[in-house]
């Protein structure tokens, strides 16, 4: 690993690292916030997944999460949103290819060679964090928009791995909205049955009650993507039918931006702390 940046922050450290990923077949960067040590107990980790057009730095520089993470003693890990590089396939817009990995394992050429963000997040990155930093094995996950989709499917597909999950304005039903249809048809092919493996609503309907974990979702009612791309009511109905412990908060006047995330990130960190710090 190579350290790219390090900054003192709320008595902890904000760092950025590069490493060679064997899963994605390219170099990858991630950012990490290490809170000030309290005792000899390794701190838990919150993974944050960002949305379309983002990289590992958006949350780090815009969300203002470090102050509360330092207070609570929670490590923040921010991976990139896709594989990157000259040899990595790219798309024809902001919503496909680099910066738009959708946190799945692509099966179609030319994407399958590099676009295995699900495996990277499930296996390689946590193992790297565990080996290189003093952290516990307790972790939670959160994200925004495409990253909210990623956080929710990571939690559903890996029962017992995360203590809790949260999201801001997540894509919850990608099989049925333009962003998801475009990405899934390219990454996964035209067989829509294969898409269901990466759709939060489909996964929730197929889930077992004993695998449910506490879930918090915030959605702004002035979000320009609310009706066409996000549709949280569809997930709320799935959660109701499955008795999933989910809180959906509609926040008046808020849009899709990091101003929205910055306004409520403290709530999400304190929500996760209830379960991470047990």
UniProtKB/Swiss-Prot annotation:
Disulfide bonds: none annotated. Keywords: Hydrolase, Serine esterase. Its EC number is 3.1.2.12. The keyword Hydrolase applies. It comes from the Bacteria. GO terms for cellular component: cytosol. GO terms for molecular function: carboxylic ester hydrolase activity; S-formylglutathione hydrolase activity. The keyword Hydrolase applies. Belongs to the esterase D family. Serine hydrolase involved in the detoxification of formaldehyde. Hydrolyzes S-formylglutathione to glutathione and formate. This is S-formylglutathione hydrolase YeiG. It comes from Shigella dysenteriae serotype 1 (strain Sd197).
